[in-house]
Structures are given as structure tokens and as C-alpha cells.
Curated annotation (Swiss-Prot):
Membrane topology listed for this record: Multi-pass membrane protein
Name of the protein this chain belongs to: Tic20 family protein Ycf60
Membrane listed as a keyword: yes
Cell compartments where the protein resides: Plastid, Chloroplast membrane
GO (cellular component) term, any one: chloroplast membrane
Disulfide cross-links: none
Domain of life per record: Eukaryota
Membrane spanning stretches: 5-25, 54-74, 102-122, 130-150, 163-183
Length: 205
């Protein structure tokens, strides 16, 4: 048991280091790529570079993974066709994420301290999408914690299963929508969450 715990901690630490290096290298490349001059400006900011859009899109894998971890197990078990797709695609990422629960939290803290709090200065566009992804991650975590704290008669009932399916679908839709907007160089417009992300981004400038 202790060996498994040590392996999970070691794996989680390695994942965090690798993720941090990917973000750091991407940021360094982003700094060296000339910004594109474009007359179409988004919120009075120069049109984001390809690297900035790619980094912003990548961040949304965090709330997506958290949503699958919190709501996806029931859905995967109930639907065979989803299980087949899952095993051939996302399982390689989700399984290690589930086995090391601290990975998501450590990535959250790392992104918040380094990029949101301003240890490394980044553009408002990237900061907005990082903050928004972190808010979505927190929302998934809180809702998932509430669901798991419900009595078994409710959590594992037909209503509980359908609620988990609905939340998973919403998580997928929001993550894909926000990631697509990031790739297009646009700011998302998710009710309440986007406004909170804008306010947090401005308050940390």
C-alpha cells in the first residue's frame, strides 16, 4: 500500500514538472514569436499569436479532466459505446489523473501562483483563459464533492446517474466552447464565469 502511494506521489510530481515545463517552454516561444498586426482587435488588445491561442486552449484540459473524474465514471459504466471511445482515447490521461488526485490541485496552485499572481508576466488574453479554466476546475471540484457527499440512495439512483450524465455533458460543452474561442483568439462569454475571470484578470494586473 505504501509502495503504491509512493508511486502515485512520484508520478504526480513528474506530471506536474512536465506540465510546468511545457507551459514554460510554450511561454518562452510565445515571447519570441512576433505579434501579428491585425486591424481586428479583441477587447482593445492585439490579435493573439498562434502560440498564445494554443497555450490558452491547452489549459482547458484541466477542467475537462476534472469533470470526467468527478462525473464521468457513472456515464462510462452505463454506456458501452462511450466506454469503448473512452478506453481508446482519454483513458490514457484520465486513469493516471484519477490515481493521483493531487495532480489537478497542484497544477491549479502552480498556474495560479505563477501566471495569475504575476510571477511570470503574460498577456491579458492568456491570463483571462487561465483564470476561466481555473474557475471551471473549481466549479467541477465543488459540485463533484457535493454529489459524493449525498446519501447513497440519491447519489447512485437513477436521478443521480442522470444528473452526473448532464454535468459531464455540460463540462464537455463548456470546455470545447471555451477552447475553441481560445483557438480563434477570442474571449469566451460564459455567464458569470467569464465576468468573474475578467474581474480577476484585471485585479491581478
Amino acid at each position: 500500500m505504501r509502495i503504491n502511494l509512493f508511486v502515485n506521489i512520484l508520478f504526480g510530481t513528474a506530471c506536474i514538472i512536465i506540465f510546468g515545463l511545457v507551459i514554460l517552454i510554450s511561454y518562452k516561444l510565445y515571447r519570441y514569436i512576433p505579434k501579428r498586426n491585425n486591424s481586428n482587435k479583441v477587447y482593445k488588445e492585439d490579435y493573439p499569436s498562434i502560440m498564445a491561442r494554443a497555450i490558452s486552449c491547452l489549459i482547458y484540459f484541466l477542467p475537462l479532466l476534472e469533470g470526467i473524474a468527478q462525473f464521468g465514471i457513472v456515464c462510462i459504466d452505463d454506456h458501452s459505446w462511450i466506454r469503448i471511445i473512452y478506453k481508446n482515447t482519454l483513458a490514457y490521461i484520465v486513469v493516471p489523473y484519477l490515481e493521483s488526485p493531487l495532480i489537478g490541485f497542484c497544477i491549479f496552485i502552480t498556474l495560479y501562483l505563477i501566471f495569475v499572481r504575476g510571477i511570470i508576466q503574460i498577456s491579458k488574453f492568456i491570463k483571462f483563459h487561465i483564470v476561466q479554466a481555473l474557475l471551471l476546475y473549481l466549479l467541477d471540484s465543488v459540485i463533484g464533492t457535493v454529489l459524493t457527499s449525498l446519501p447513497l440512495e440519491i447519489g447512485y439512483s437513477f436521478i443521480g446517474d442522470r444528473l452526473a450524465d448532464t454535468l459531464l455533458l455540460i463540462t464537455f460543452m463548456i470546455s470545447i466552447y471555451a477552447g475553441t474561442d481560445a483557438l480563434k483568439g477570442q474571449y469566451s462569454n460564459i455567464p458569470l464565469i467569464s465576468e468573474a475571470a475578467k474581474m480577476q484578470s484585471k485585479s491581478t494586473d
